[in-house]
């Protein structure tokens, strides 16, 4: 029989923890469960989890996506990310090639994850 209010064990097994103290919970795709858990130290741990070492260039882009999120309440997909980067950091850095060089694969997804934001809505 079905019991209301009980949590299935499999639901909990979908999550993992970023830190040894089990304070920072990640969803199955590696995004923070609680955005309030984010700080620069957490960003470093998330980057390490992605096998990245954050440089000042990475931090510039993290600030761009966090600012974008603060304004629009959503993480940017690639085209809005390129545009926001161009506006904030100039023509040279506002190019998808530059973003790919720092966040290979899917810059919007990797940046949102490391910046402690939800997954961009149109990223698979």
For each of these PLM feature ranges, what is it?
Residues 28, 36-37, 42, 58, ...:
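Solvent-exposed, flexible loop/coil residues
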Residues 66-73, 91, 100:
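Amphipathic alpha-helical interaction elements
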Residues 1-8:
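Short, Lys/Arg-enriched N-terminal segments with co-localized hydrophobic residues
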Residues 33, 43, 47-71, 78, ...:
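Metallocofactor- and cofactor-centric catalytic cores in central/energy metabolism, strongly enriched
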Residues 11:
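Structured beta-strand/loop patches that form or line metal/cofactor-binding pockets in enzymes
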Residues 26, 78, 86-124:
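Helix-rich interaction surfaces within compact, conserved domain-sized segments
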Residues 18-50:
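N-terminal first-folded block
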Residues 14-15:
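Extreme N-terminal leader/activation tails
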């Amino acid at each position: 029989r079905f019991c209301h209010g009980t949590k299935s064990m499999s639901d909990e097994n979908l999550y993992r923890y970023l830190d040894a103290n089990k304070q920072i919970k990640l969803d199955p795709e590696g995004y923070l469960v609680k955005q309030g858990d984010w700080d620069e130290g957490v960003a470093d741990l998330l980057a390490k989890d992605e096998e990245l070492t954050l440089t000042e260039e990475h931090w510039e882009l993290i600030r761009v996506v966090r600012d974008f999120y603060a304004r629009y309440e959503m993480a940017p997909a690639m085209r809005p990310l390129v545009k926001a980067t161009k506006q904030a950091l100039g023509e040279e850095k506002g190019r998808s090639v530059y973003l790919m060089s720092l966040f290979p694969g899917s810059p919007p997804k990797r940046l949102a994850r490391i910046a402690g934001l939800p997954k961009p809505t149109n990223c698979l």
